[in-house]
Each structure stands twice: as C-alpha cells, then as structure tokens.
Amino acid sequence: MMCNCCHCHWRRRCQRLPCALTLLLLLPLAVASEGPNRCDTIYQGFAECLIRLGDGMGRGGELQTVCRSWNDFHACASRVLSGCPEEAAAVWESLQQEARRAPHPDNLHILCGAPVSVRERIAGPETNQETLRATAPALAPAPAPVLLAAALALACLLGPLA
C-alpha cells in the first residue's frame, strides 16, 4: 500500500514512500496536538533525528555504519518522544511493528535487527581471536532512495507550514 504526496513537486518519488514512513513523519503533528506544551519541540526534534540519520547514512554504505545510524535514529526519536503523552510511545511502537513486517529487501528493521552469530573455524585444539569469525546476512546496498524519499516527504509536510 502506497501513499500519495499531493503537495510535493517530486511526486514520483513521494508515491514510492511507504505508508509506515509517512505515518512516522506525521507522528509529530498527532502528538503535538495531544498534550499541552509537552511536545512543543517535536518537529524540531524529529527533524534533527532525520538529519543525523541522513548524515550517518552518508558516511558509508557498510551495514555496520548503516545500522549504527539506524539505531541512533531510534534512540533519538525515543528521546524526542520522552516528554510527550504515553499515546505517542504507543503510536511509535505500532509504527515500528508495521515497519518490521514490511516485506522489503532493504528493510532496516530486518537488516539491522538480525543477530550476529559467531562460528568457530576448526584450526586445532586452541581457540583464540583468529579462529573466531562473525557472520551476518549478506550486505545489501544502502537504501539511499528510501532515505531521499523520506527527506522529500518531510520537506513536503513542512513546506506548507513554513
């Protein structure tokens, strides 16, 4: 299921934006209207989280770097929501659950949430650091088009407000 971004002149990219991400971007509006002065800076906070996520993704396409940025984004978003009503945390969690179920090959919840297993190479009776090798799922290219779409959707949403 896809959402349309009707105010955006980058319509083709916005049409590819998953609804879960659109809801994530609309979360600040819903939360800000819920409580008195507890979420005054939620737009600024989420914008800063998204900018940091984009900056982190731009540092390199290695899965470890991408996942570190992704995990930092979630920690940042949680800090932004910490001063908001409890309903905001429930919405955030439901968005994360929906995103985890999305059957996209570049789903960061799946790529970054996969456990890293350690297997031992059989090299003799001794076990040391050289005989242990971490394995993880095959590296996938960084989902730059999805991040670009997220940034464009945010610009679409914030554009009429400015």
Swiss-Prot record:
Mind telling me what this protein is named? Answer: Neuritin-like protein
Principal subcellular localization? membrane
Family label: Belongs to the neuritin family.
The compartments listed are: Cell membrane
> Key word tRNA processing present in the record?
no
Cellular component GO terms held in the UniProt record: axon; extracellular space; membrane; plasma membrane; side of membrane
Gene Ontology MF annotations: identical protein binding
State if Membrane is listed as a keyword. Answer: yes
UniProt cross-references to InterPro entries, sorted A to Z = Neuritin_fam
The biological process GO terms on file are: neuron projection extension
Membrane topology, from the record: Lipid-anchor; GPI-anchor
Q: Where are the transmembrane segments?
A: none
Signal peptide span: 1-32
